[in-house]
Amino acid sequence: MSENNNDKITVKRTLTLKRSVLETSTVKQNFSHGRTKAVVVETKRRKITRTDEKAETPQPITKPHVAPQRSRPRFEDAKPNEPTAKSNLSSAEIEARLRALEEAHIQERIIREQAEEEARRAKEREESLRQTIQKTEIDETPQEEEEPTLQTQTPSLSPAQSQIEPINIPITPKNTTVIEKRKADETKEDDRNSRRTNLAKSEVRAPKVLKGADEKRRGKITLNSALDEEGSARGRSMAAMRRRQEKFKRAQNQEPKEKISREVILPETITIQELAQRMTERSVDVIKFLMKQGQMMKPGDVIDADVAELIAVEFGHTVKRVLESDVEEGIFNIADNPQKMQLRPPVVTIMGHVDHGKTSLLDAIRKANVVSGEAGGITQHIGAYQVEKNGQKITFIDTPGHAAFTAMRARGARVTDIAVLVVAADDSVMPQTIESINHAKAAGVPIIVAINKIDKPTANAQKVRTELLHHEVFVETMGGETLEVEVSAKTGQNLDKLLEAILLQAEILDLKADPQRTAEGVVIEAKLDRGRGSVATVLVQKGTLHPSDIIVAGNEWGRVRALIDDHGRHVKEAVPSTPIEILGMQGTPQAGDRFAVVTHEAKAREIAEYRQRLARDKAVARQTGSRGSLEQMMSKLQTTGVKEFPLIIKGDVQGSIEAIASALEKLGNEEVRARIVHSAAGGITESDISLAEASHSAVIGFNVRANKQARDCAKTQGIEIRYYNIIYDLVDDIKAAMSGLRSPEQRETFLGNAEILEVFNITKIGKVAGCLVTEGKIERGAGVRLIRDNIVIHEGKLKTLKRFKDEVNEVQSGQECGIAFENYEDIRTGDIIETFHIEHINRTL
């Protein structure tokens, strides 16, 4: 213990004055994002007396009396603690620490005053800046900072304020002593005095550097740099104030824009969205206007030009209506050159009733056998052929006689020059004969009557002539002008006379055409052939058609790759009145479409796209127009219970598909109708099966077959594919299938009456009526009605029918029996029981 005590009070440890002068402290540095670092600071000071320090202490400029008052009590308060501190500090060390503490308080007061002065000046600068911007509105560029320590986020100073020289000020009063200690490399008193003097002088002329200067130099903004000591936010930048002023100025000077009236170009059909864009209006505004008019539409709905014009006028615009068909100008109805007109062969259409021998007559003329190639021996296509008689050519067009091919006959009559009406001598005038007469009269073409089958014993040509008079067809033998020829396709009798009559009629008509102009004609038939693509049978009416010509037919266009005549030979040109097959169409045109040759492929594509768009828009417009209101839709669903029979039809040619669709439309009634989901020329593909599966449709193939992928897909999905080659069979099968969708007819048959004589109440059975059969008979399982005072009060079925104690199947008139009803016991004496039987009968179309 004595040794330890002696160690503590040894002379060596008490006389270490050098270590007491070297002061050690720890400073905690704060960085952005919450990072800190502890730094050890050692300060070496020289021992100086208190009197010298007092003499050298500078007096503050603003309030010189404050320093001695604040430093003295602190010094006196620290003195009593010296004896009781039990520390080894000398008086010089204590005085040095007190001096440092006093200096810190002086610097804190100076910095606080400088901060207040700087806040006042910043407020004045901001106020003057706002007034300057409002008055002059001149762009000012912020002045460059002279030193990095003076970087601030406040606007640039005025010229008077910018003359103040900046000075380095510690960032916070808390770290002032630490920063000065860090900068003090020497412990001389004159350095400390000069630094204190500079701080005192800076009170008057030094503006305070904002707290975020160092952080701004680093390129990062922290929470400490964003707020100053009093918690006030940073000032707005000059660019922000300028933007705010410009925005305010625009708002003050903004005037309501006048509505601009535009000239809106309206085609035949247009969508609501496109109409709004052409008017520079919003689609929502147009739809609101239509809603006020009672029409519910969407931006993608198509409207016609009349509705679009009303909308445009309502919105204050002018309208200029144009026709998109302008692209078709100049391709049809081109005037022929009279000097280049030449005689052309006549186009003759063979018309008449089915099985009257039209195709057989044409075969006899051509010396061919077309009938054997047609399924069922009936013509289901339009055939175009050319024969030669006495060096003159005649073009024949054979039309079907079946009732389903009305459209084909109408097309044949429109493109013809002469109509040959074939009437069977043993069958006389029939419905399709009358229809053919009407088609020929509507087309305005002359008629030549060919009375066929005169070789039959039952032939009666005079009866044919007489019946034709009822339809205003006056033959020459009856005093008229219509030529008539009695022929026999089987024996070839009088075929030459028929051809001579045709040539005579053509000579009377004086048929001419210009072969040197561009070709123009009509599509007779079209189909999709495997290996050859789309094949169109056309009749050239004007001009000459060559390979590599660009043609437009209906909604399709193409470049002619090959021309094939009726004998299957490739030809180099097709002159007027020539039937020809064209290869190279981009798609399959519709039968009856007109075709023409155009000069450029771009024009052909433009015309085809216009026609496709027109057809598509019209279809959409029809659907939109039939939409109706919600009340109409609901009432229609409640009142109409029409069942639909969906079908997908694929045929070999467009004409056959058209005939099938026309025949199926006639089968419908108020209960069931056929709906053709899709129809096209060509074979049955896998996409057709997928469509049938989605729409629950049956697939019909007319003279076509399904490929292997389609057959496998149909087998997997359970889709039925039916093949037909005769239109009779197809229509009959569809008719029978549609008849099955109709609800059966209920037919009631009266059986008999029985009078209730007594009512018995039997256990486990209930009430049983003892009856006497007065009329007819009573059968078990028949329907019964309970009649009381000539009013039917119950209708149901018999539960029990007994005679004496035995169950019987029927009871004849005049016999007594016991009758019990199912789920009904309100029977009385004197009631009449009527029995009947209901028969369900399937109805047909």
From Swiss-Prot:
Residues 44-91, 119-256 are annotated as: Disordered. GTP binds at residues 352-359, 398-402, 452-455. Residues 377-381 are annotated as: G2. It comes from the Bacteria. GO terms for molecular function: GTP binding; GTPase activity; guanosine tetraphosphate binding; translation initiation factor activity. PANTHER family: TR-TYPE G DOMAIN-CONTAINING PROTEIN, TRANSLATION INITIATION FACTOR IF-2-RELATED. This is Translation initiation factor IF-2.
